């Protein structure tokens, strides 16, 4: 079978390797689609701090079960699935308490261990989640980033009836806004400096879409929610400007959730956060229930994935996909690799 390998930053080869053997508790997945995310782009540019080369990528994935191990009873051949890419020890304190996304030895497929970018991939059945038969494989590859969003939204508990502001309308910000709305938020506002991204958010049903190059964030919150402003602000941009906006304009005693990963050291006014008794939370990846809840939101028509798909590339055009993203960064949301198209 064919397998993608990034040998060095910006260099991709394809090699023939044997189809993997399936252990008793595993399934063999015929890989259909793979999404490229911001972390993959960091690997492509040699800027991911926890990835060594060579590496086979692919952690946002959909596929079809081609074979099941003899001890696997919950899956069958031909079933549509997605894969949770976390590899965890199961022994550390977080793992023992159900928080394996915080494992002390956490590895992620496509970064610290072999990813799914091959025609077939053998994986523990426990890491496989079924997707509906009427869900496209492109959408199935986007369940992983949706799970990130769902997990982030859940960090504040139940969002029903809350007013939510989301900073950053890229793929994750868009999905956080959609997930919050789908999970019962009263009203959701999203901000960005890109009209294209804001138009995508509007297409996905977000209530208020604000370009902060044209309108002050604090003013926009009052306009959207009234003088009480937002109950929760999700920072999905991850820079000093957006975090500074969140701290400056958050209602006293409200919540800020850090969803985006900061590229460098954050320099924000924590004195204001302290004085205003702001509850600053963070979020890390997801767990199985976030996959299940995300799939349900899509199935119920509360989250729309297809508008986020910008372009699809054939498997052997993996490098062209990265080049396309670099050349069209301002107009690209999500690029998908079709593994079965060579």
Regions inferred by a protein language model and the residue ranges of each:
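N-terminal glycine-rich cofactor-binding segment
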Residues: 3-21, 38-67, 82-83, 100-114
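Mid-domain Rossmann-like dinucleotide-binding core that forms the NAD(H)/NADP(H) cofactor-binding site
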Residues: 135-214
């Amino acid at each position: 079978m064919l397998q993608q390998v990034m040998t060095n930053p910006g260099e991709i080869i394809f090699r023939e390797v044997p189809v993997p053997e399936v252990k008793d508790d595993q399934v063999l997945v015929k890989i259909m689609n793979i999404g490229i995310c911001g972390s993959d782009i960091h690997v492509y540019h040699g800027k991911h701090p926890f990835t060594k080369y060579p590496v086979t990528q692919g952690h946002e994935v959909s596929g079809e079960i081609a074979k099941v191990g003899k001890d696997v009873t919950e899956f069958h051949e031909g079933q549509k699935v997605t894969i949770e890419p976390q590899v965890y020890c199961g022994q550390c304190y977080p793992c023992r308490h159900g928080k394996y996304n915080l494992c002390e030895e956490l590895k992620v497929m496509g970064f610290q261990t072999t990813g799914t970018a091959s025609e077939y991939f053998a994986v523990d059945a426990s890491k496989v989640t079924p997707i509906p038969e009427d869900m496209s494989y492109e959408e199935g590859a986007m369940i992983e980033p949706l799970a990130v969003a769902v997990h982030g939204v859940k960090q504040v508990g139940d969002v029903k009836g809350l007013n939510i502001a989301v900073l950053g309308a890229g793929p994750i910000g868009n999905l956080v806004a959609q997930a919050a709305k789908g999970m019962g938020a009263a009203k959701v506002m999203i901000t960005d400096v890109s009209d294209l991204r804001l138009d995508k958010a509007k297409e996905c049903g977000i209530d208020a879409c604000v370009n902060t190059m044209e309108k002050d964030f604090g003013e926009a919150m009052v306009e959207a929610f009234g003088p009480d402003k937002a109950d929760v602000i999700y920072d999905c941009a991850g820079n000093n400007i957006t975090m500074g906006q969140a701290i400056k304009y958050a209602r006293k005693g409200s919540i800020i959730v850090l969803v985006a990963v900061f590229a460098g050291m954050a320099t924000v006014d924590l004195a204001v956060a302290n004085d205003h008794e702001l509850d600053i939370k963070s979020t890390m990846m997801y767990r199985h229930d976030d996959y299940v809840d995300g799939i349900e939101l899509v199935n119920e028509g509360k989250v729309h994935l297809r508008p986020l798909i910008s372009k699809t590339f054939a498997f052997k055009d993996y490098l062209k996909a990265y080049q396309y993203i670099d050349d069209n960064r301002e107009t690209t949301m999500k690029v998908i690799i079709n593994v079965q198209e060579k």
